[in-house]
Curated annotation (Swiss-Prot):
GO terms for molecular function: ATP binding; ATP phosphoribosyltransferase activity. The lineage of its organism: Bacteria, Thermotogati, Thermotogota, Thermotogae, Thermotogales. Its EC number is 2.4.2.17. HAMAP family: HisG_Short. InterPro entries: ATP_PRibTrfase_cat, ATP_PRibTrfase_CS, ATP_PRibTrfase_HisG, ATP_PRibTrfase_HisG_short. The keyword ATP-binding applies. It comes from Thermotoga petrophila (strain ATCC BAA-488 / DSM 13995 / JCM 10881 / RKU-1). Lacks the C-terminal regulatory region which is replaced by HisZ. It comes from the Bacteria. Heteromultimer composed of HisG and HisZ subunits. It is an enzyme of class 2 (transferase). Catalyzes the condensation of ATP and 5-phosphoribose 1-diphosphate to form N'-(5'-phosphoribosyl)-ATP (PR-ATP). Has a crucial role in the pathway because the rate of histidine biosynthesis seems to be controlled primarily by regulation of HisG enzymatic activity. Pathway: Amino-acid biosynthesis; L-histidine biosynthesis; L-histidine from 5-phospho-alpha-D-ribose 1-diphosphate: step 1/9. This is ATP phosphoribosyltransferase.
Length: 208
């Protein structure tokens, strides 16, 4: 039996649709658990997906580039599933640019932000926040923010502009390396079926 970690929220419906197209059915479904004949799905916070795999509770999971880089876990990443692409960006108040000297940066991703600052040679004070990061420059808590954006609309609404793109975020299929060894046949079979469904869906999409 395969155990999967599924991220709650915007990716949940997409992932579950792919699983059902792959041929899995679920006899029991709740907000935290989906159970079928050959599969169990744990519905978890996106940031918790790698934790479930690292600790051996789940064999396969789905999570974004942002989570993988923030958590810095060693998981197998065979391919990603097509979703709306978003970006991790550095942003600040419109027209002010990047300040000289020490920079106060608010973010939900302190590890990603720290490494980014180091690559730029900046002296930064990182302010970890759990939500509403775009409020930090308005309130005077930070000079800049590092956050995820898809369309840039929320940034514009708060009079912020993108100053740098740090990386593109995709949704990765991730595999526990131990499971890949001990359940290789099951894992490989699942990945092949999933990839086939994804490729079929892509081929069915109308071309512009």
């Amino acid at each position: 039996m395969l155990k999967l970690a599924i991220p709650k929220g915007r990716l949940e419906e997409k992932v579950m649709t792919y699983l059902k197209k792959t041929g899995f059915t679920f006899e029991r479904e709740s907000s935290i658990l989906r159970e079928g004949k050959d599969i169990v799905c744990f519905m978890v916070r996106p940031f918790d997906v790698p934790t479930y795999l690292v600790h051996g509770v789940a064999d396969i999971g789905f999570c974004g580039t942002d989570v993988l880089l923030e958590k810095e876990t060693s998981l197998i990443q065979p391919f990603f599933i097509p979703t709306n692409i978003s970006r991790m960006v550095l942003a600040g108040p419109k027209g002010k640019g990047i300040p000289e000297g020490e920079k106060r940066i608010a973010t939900k991703f302190p590890n990603v932000t720290q490494r980014y600052c180091e690559t730029r040679g900046w002296h930064c004070r990182i302010i970890p926040l759990k939500g509403s990061v775009e409020l930090a420059p308005i309130a005077g808590l930070a000079d800049l923010i590092v956050d995820i954006t898809e369309t840039g609309r929320t940034l514009k609404e708060n009079n912020l502009e993108i100053l740098d793109e740090i990386f593109v975020i995709r949704t990765h299929v991730v595999v526990n390396p131990v499971s890949y060894r001990t359940k290789r046949e099951e894992v490989v079979s699942f990945l092949e079926k999933l990839q086939e469904v994804i490729e079929h869906d892509f081929d069915e999409q109308p071309r512009r």
